[in-house]
Amino acid sequence: MVKNLIFWLVITVVLMSIFQNFNTNDVNNHKVDYSTFLSEVNQDQIREAYINGRMISVTKKDSSKYTTYIPINDPKLLDNLLVKRVKIIGAIPEEPSLFISILISWFPMLLLIGVWIFFMRQMQMGGGKGAMSFGKSKARMLSEDQIQTTFADVAGCDEAKEEVSELVEYLKEPSRFQKLGGKIPKGILMVGPPGTGKTLLAKAIAGEAKVPFFTISGSDFVEMFVGVGASRVRDMFEHSRKSAPCIIFIDEIDAVGRQRGAGLGGGHDEREQTLNQMLVEMDGFDGNEGIILIAATNRPDVLDPALLRPGRFDRQVIVALPDIRGREQILKVHMRKVPLSKDVDPMIIARGTPGFSGADLANLVNEAALFAARLDKRVVSMLEFERAKDKMMMGSERRSMVMSDFQKESTAYHEAGHVIIGRLVPDHDPAHKVTIIPRGRALGVTFFLPESDTLSISRQKLESQISTLYGGRLAEEIIYGAKNVSTGAYNDIKIATSLAKNMVTQWGFSEKLGPLLYAEEEGEIFLGRSVAKAKHMSDETARIIDEEVKLLIEINYSRARNILNENIDILHAMKEALIKYETIDAFQIDDLMKRREVRQPKGWIETDTNK
């Protein structure tokens, strides 16, 4: 920063001195045209004329002054002035100094060189570390005092913590392992969906072991200049050796560790040179150096096999989505700084958030706190957590959207059809909440909440899901006729078709085709294994697959139609409840399915609008 200020200060001083050299002493005098000057000479009003090139500084007999400019060379001017007895003073031409002459001739070139150096420094190093330092590592080093994260801050992944806990013991006491001939894994690859806490777990390892922590993203290695990535890899490992024992953490390593020869661009590019250098460095340092490389990715399938072999990343730690107990622990960690009402139960929230990652749960707590802050509450209650969960699962409410009475009615029938089918088909998740308030891009939403974490899905459950997906379209068809069915079921049809196709081609749920895999490979061009899309079936087999998919859809479509026809009274009653209350939960759904009077939702107040 100081060097940049000095650089621009020098340029400013030089420019000011150059401009000052060309200034005249009489720039502030009043200017008059040349014809007026000649007229006043003829009228004998001029006392003195100071001639400096083509500029004349004039002093009149009344002591007033002005300047004028000779537009063309006038040979009679001096004679006229002498005739009128005007005092003539000629300016002595000033020769510029040698320094000014050299500066004027070289200044443009020096300015261009200075600007080039400045911009190269800013673009490449972002802070004045030198214009030729492109190959320096961008890894940021955090000392043991800067890392406050510990295993207590990481929840919901007990198995992963147990896997990496021996790293902490090794970094604290390496001789304990070395004297028995044991070697700690040189590299650990953390694999898991986004938001599961891979980066947080790596920081906790460094925080527990109290060792330096180098962090860098996979995309920071590759630049526009050839060879920069490999140079940065060398520089990073060189610095880490000086700080050993230490941890190097590479986030999103698939940006640089993608399989070589991938895509259409050939096999020799800057990214592959960087990967080759990383492979050499990982295999080059000995285990007793105390350098542990940890990387994180959610795309392990695209990584180069050489990167995953023993001796490099020889251990994979799966950081999966948390189960119900893990979600409860994560919620408790994030609720530490939030004032909570007595009715808040983390276990109930955890039970209602299957499939949520650690990042999702952190966002849930934050959204609940924001809801409470908007209402000027002092504590966050269970109601705010419920509203935050609905927002994350079903989208934000769009109450400003104007819907006609017919649109509300058709949406209510559509959502009621989903709910009724979902409640009456076997092995289906129970309906948790249904609303006709527009949320996100949907006019209405039906949300089914699993009773437990889903590990595998049975054929019966898949067929029940297909029937439920068509429940909305069938409800419209039964009430309004086939010609008046809307396009609102587009996404339902898309999901149902995909499920049926997977059941036939991937999961072996077709009696005619048997338990064989018929799925075509997708995304191969990005992995570099094939440019053309491979086809693993004959035309006749493809025709049979289409027939089986259609048959599966027709069976479940017909089942859903029969269920709605047999429960048409519940369909009408649920439509009325949705129009009145706009949102109903599992308790109201139970009342409707048992043909009882529907209780009012909690906190609902009847107004003239919803009458």
Curated annotation (Swiss-Prot):
It holds the Pfam family Peptidase_M41. Residues 1, 120-611 are cytoplasmic. GO terms for biological process: protein catabolic process; proteolysis. One of its GO terms (cellular component) is plasma membrane. Binds 1 zinc ion per subunit. It comes from the Bacteria. The active site is at 415. It is a multi-pass membrane protein. It is found in: Cell membrane. The keyword Endoplasmic reticulum does not apply. Keywords: ATP-binding, Cell membrane, Hydrolase, Membrane, Metal-binding, Metalloprotease, Nucleotide-binding, Protease, Transmembrane, Transmembrane helix, Zinc. The keyword Nucleotide-binding applies. One of its GO terms (molecular function) is ATP hydrolysis activity. It is an enzyme of class 3 (hydrolase). Its EC number is 3.4.24.-. Residues 23-98 are extracellular. Its main location: membrane. Homohexamer. This is ATP-dependent zinc metalloprotease FtsH. The gene is ftsH.
